[in-house]
Amino acid sequence: RKFATQADLMESVEVVIAGYQKKNRILSDKEKLIVSYHEVGHALVAAMQTNSAPVQKITIIPRTSGALGYTMQVEEGEHFLMNKTEMENKIATFTGGRAAEELIFGEITTGASNDIEQATKFARAMITRYGMNEEFDMVAMESVSNQYLGGDSSLTCSMETQTLIDQKVVQLVKEQHQKAKKILEDNVMKLHEIAKFLYEHETITGEEFMAVSYTHLTLPTNREV
């Protein structure tokens, strides 16, 4: 071919995000179903919260990064700042996959390992770096060395305060996990519908997801409309 297509460009973006498609990794039917619900859990929780980046694609095609599937969200326009609500929403979205597994299968898997890491990272940063905890206010609890080289971070507080920080991190992640569960419980029929579609087609575009998602969806009671 002489020209790259839009699909080629999208695949290039996905290679950067998640690696190449690993077509020789064949999931069992049960694993494929679990991954379908897991990814749709992320997407639904994201869609049902304010100020969340739009879902562009959901797929259960394994990638060389090790991901068995992923949900792609892309900000509309440039976005340099995140407020407290947006960060809490990100944490809730990270927990959405595990929440879907719990709700549908009554069991949890190892598939949420990266989600757990990211949710914890965001929660800790909110408390130690961004002053988003009322008790600590605008006191820096963490310092970062070689910030522009992806440097290491270290806590700059007493052991007692570090213990309290750990408690605050756990509390924050738990709260957002419960929020994710509530969103999925309120929209369980859509969860089933979209997960079934993903299971059958392996990939859903953002347009397809939004077309289905906003048909008779139940909005959270605290959502601003």
What are these regions (language model features)?
Residues 39-40, 225:
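Generic detector of well-ordered alpha-helical packing
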Residues 8, 208, 221:
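Ca2+-coordinating acidic residues in Ca2+-binding motifs
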Residues 33-37, 43-217:
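Soluble catalytic regions of large protease machineries
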Residues 1-8, 16-33, 131-137:
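C-terminal helical "lid" subdomain and adjoining coupling/linker elements of P-loop NTPases
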Residues 216-225:
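Single conserved hydrophobic/aromatic residue that forms the stacking wall/gate
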Residues 10-15, 64-67:
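Short, conserved phosphate-binding/catalytic loop or strand-edge motifs used
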